[in-house]
Amino acid sequence: MLVALTFIWGCNWPLFPLAMRELSVWTFRAVSLSGGGLLLLTVARLRGIPLGVPRAHWGMLLIAAVCYLAVWNVASGFSAITIPSGQSAVLGFTMPLWVAVLSALFLGERLQTRNLLALALGAAGVLLLLLPGLQAYADAPLGFAAGILAGLGWAGGTVMLKRHPIPVPAIVSTGWQLLLSSMPVGVLAVALHAGPVFLPSTLTVVVVSYITMVPMAVGNLWWFSLAGQLPANVAGLSVIMVPVVAMISGALMRGEPLGPPQVAAMACCMGALALTILKPKPASAG
């Protein structure tokens, strides 16, 4: 699941500029969030899974949805169209660093030596990926800020749900979060729309449909399933390879930079991932 999620999300980033050639970031995200939410809730219903959420948990569900899904999706989308998509992915995936800080502050999760080393390797990988894009960030500071905001929003939503878990199946929780987060984004899409209503091109429809069904619906379902099973800081580090895949796919699909810094970053991120998911064997007695 983790390997598939890494490739689904990593290869998703170069598609953002294609999706937003004709649509605003607000319209694109409103469509993909609402479509992904409706798809998951429909599948849950067809499988006979109750869609209800206990009344006491609706507030937290809404707050987490806005922090992660609304802030992350809008900010990352804006960042991806103002700076190279691979560089945007790197900024968004500073998320594990923010999760480590927030989970220590609010969840009391202690970072073991392996986690600290993985975090250091992950930070080194992110730094190596950031360096080639410094000029792009200087030319588009709002894109840089939006990328960092995306990572913070994702981290905040993850920690909230770890502290206040929603007692429903992951497919139901994910579906409602996608649908709830689409509402404020949809309102802004309508309010900020300028110009005549038009029918998007076939390419735009295909790209947005794919993003809605696979990275948005399936990807988020898998992410919430993983996040529910792992400590917050480990869950965050588990997706550290996504920006590396985004860089490689951006280079292949859009001719974005790929050189020694990216290769070194890949080695750092692979080391961080190995430390995170591979547990040492217990010492044998005697």
Q: Where on the chain are the PLM-derived regions?
A:
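Hydrophobic transmembrane alpha-helices of multi-pass small-molecule transport proteins
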Residues: 35, 40, 62, 94, ...
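Hydrophobic/aromatic residues within transmembrane alpha-helices
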Residues: 19, 28, 32, 79, ...
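Cytoplasmic-side transmembrane-helix entry/capping segments in multi-pass membrane proteins
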Residues: 56-64, 111-123, 143-144, 168-178
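Specific transmembrane alpha-helical segments of multi-pass solute transporters/efflux pumps
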Residues: 8, 12-13, 41-92, 128, ...
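Juxtamembrane helix-entry segments on the extracytoplasmic side of multipass membrane proteins
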Residues: 21-30, 53-59, 116, 131-156, ...
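Helix-helix packing/entry segments at the starts of transmembrane helices
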Residues: 29-31, 69, 73, 88-94, ...
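Glycine-/small-residue-enriched transmembrane alpha-helix faces in small-molecule transporters
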Residues: 1-32, 36, 78, 136-163, ...
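Transmembrane alpha-helices of multi-pass small-molecule transport proteins
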Residues: 22-71, 98-102, 152-157, 174-193, ...
